[in-house]
């Protein structure tokens, strides 16, 4: 995120971080959401950046919706990811941040009232570039693109799939 923070992007970054924290600390879903809402979302008075790990301008409803849905639907999301991942990359082998990012992206792709698939893919690709310098962003793009075509084929009707 450059100088101008995009609130929906900030919400997605926070959701990835919250999913990571919940998995690593084995904290309850609601405890993690409450911690983020109280201590991590929104800028401190007189500051407008990401000081002290805060995420300014995040939309709390979108953040909460992604975290709740990704956690509650993990038993549906994980098999989708396992199928989309290369065989040599089991879900458990992935970096925990990458796993959280893919779960959040897959969760949004499953939301029928969510943004168009290309928006979801681009948002999480941008987030992946913020966390990773290697091949992970390409992996995110490929996996989320495959899931988008599987979950919302009507939005890709008439396109040839590149291979």
From Swiss-Prot:
GO terms for molecular function: RNA binding. Gene3D superfamilies: NusB-like (1.10.940.10). It comes from the Bacteria. Keywords: RNA-binding, Transcription, Transcription antitermination, Transcription regulation. Pfam families: NusB. GO terms for biological process: DNA-templated transcription termination; transcription antitermination. GO terms for cellular component: cytosol. The keyword Transcription applies. Belongs to the NusB family. Involved in transcription antitermination. Required for transcription of ribosomal RNA (rRNA) genes. Binds specifically to the boxA antiterminator sequence of the ribosomal RNA (rrn) operons. HAMAP family: NusB. NCBIfam families: nusB. This is Transcription antitermination protein NusB. The lineage of its organism: Bacteria, Pseudomonadati, Pseudomonadota, Alphaproteobacteria, Acetobacterales.
């Amino acid at each position: 995120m450059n100088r101008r923070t995009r609130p929906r992007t900030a919400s997605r970054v926070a959701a990835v971080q919250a999913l990571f924290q919940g998995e690593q600390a084995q904290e309850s879903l609601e405890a993690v959401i409450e911690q983020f809402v109280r201590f991590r979302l929104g800028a401190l008075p007189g500051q407008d950046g990401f000081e002290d790990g805060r995420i300014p301008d995040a939309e709390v409803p979108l953040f909460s919706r992604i975290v709740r849905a990704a956690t509650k639907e993990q038993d549906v999301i994980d098999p989708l990811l396992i199928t989309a991942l290369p065989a040599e990359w089991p879900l458990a082998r992935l970096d925990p941040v990458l796993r959280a990012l893919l779960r959040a992206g897959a969760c949004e792709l499953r939301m029928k009232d969510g943004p168009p698939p290309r928006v979801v893919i681009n948002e999480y690709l941008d987030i992946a570039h913020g966390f990773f310098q290697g091949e992970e962003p390409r992996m995110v793009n490929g996996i989320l693109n495959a899931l988008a075509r599987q979950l919302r084929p009507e939005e890709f009707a008439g396109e040839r799939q590149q291979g």
